[in-house]
Amino acid sequence: MNPLVIKLGGVLLESDDAMKRLFEALVDYQKFYKRHVSVIHGGGRLIDNLMNKLSLPVKKKNGLRITPSEHINIITGALAGTANKTLLAWALKYNINAIGLCLADGGSIDVERLDENLGHVGKAIPGSPLFLKKLFKEGAIPIISSIGITKDGLLMNVNADLAATALATTLQANLILLSDISSILDGKGQRITEIDSIQAEKLIMQGIITNGMIVKVRAALEAARVLRRPVDIASWQNTEKLKLLFNGVNIGTRVYV
């Protein structure tokens, strides 16, 4: 069975209830299945709250956070520090063998600067799977923040959905984009169970898919194209359904090329 990459986002990182549900589902899943699992996360809301406390501006362009050089150390601390180690702490609380990493560790994901106008925002490029495969052999779950490092040693903030796509490509894994959003919704607010690139672009043009969801959907489409398999967008909110999701059942929106 292919490895599984679970991307965490939304309010999950700030909710004890969400953490409890997620890690209970992972523990139960690992009791019955030997599939290798890797977790990757961002922490946009955590960063927004921190920036507001520091009276620093929060600016985005096409759903991507503008990250000037004076902000990258703060964002690195929030993502690779607070967010990553909070997830690691929850894993240890549930006796899960986990290790906290960033994209650069083991050369797992290469990163280049995406756009000078965005500052320290990186483009994730699939790297080497060898380090992560060694961790899998030891029975560990890598928990990876979306902070990367360029070849010339610059810290980069990478959109976590796009980082997850690169990670899934590196591992030839199935990908789940997990957040507080249960699925993509149509113009009437109803769940879309399956969507392809033509349908997605139509909903974007109509203004039904907007803002950060555009990045999420396009990341899922790119992952589906590269991996040649569908990608799931789903919510963490139902523990029982999470177990089904980890085993390949569609509980949200399944994205096809």
Curated annotation (Swiss-Prot):
Reactions performed catalytically: N-acetyl-L-glutamate + ATP = N-acetyl-L-glutamyl 5-phosphate + ADP
Entry's localization field: Cytoplasm
GO molecular function: acetylglutamate kinase activity; ATP binding
GO (cellular component) term, any one: cytoplasm
Pathway where it operates: Amino-acid biosynthesis; L-arginine biosynthesis; N(2)-acetyl-L-ornithine from L-glutamate: step 2/4
InterPro entries, sorted: AceGlu_kinase-like_sf, AcgluKinase_fam, ArgB, Asp/Glu/Uridylate_kinase
EC top class named in words: transferase
Residues given in the record as ATP binding sites: 180-185, 208-210
Pfam families: AA_kinase
Keywords noted in UniProt: Amino-acid biosynthesis, Arginine biosynthesis, ATP-binding, Cytoplasm, Kinase, Nucleotide-binding, Transferase
Binding site for substrate: 43-44, 65, 157
Entry-linked Gene3D superfamilies: Acetylglutamate kinase-like
GO biological process: arginine biosynthetic process via ornithine; L-arginine biosynthetic process
EC number, as in UniProt: 2.7.2.8
UniProt-annotated site: Transition state stabilizer, residues: 7, 216
Coiled coil spans: none
Family according to the record: Belongs to the acetylglutamate kinase family. ArgB subfamily.
Task performed by this protein: Catalyzes the ATP-dependent phosphorylation of N-acetyl-L-glutamate.
Summary of subunit composition and partner proteins: Homodimer.
NCBIfam families named among the record's database cross-references: argB (TIGR00761)
Record's protein name: Acetylglutamate kinase
Gene name tied to this protein: argB
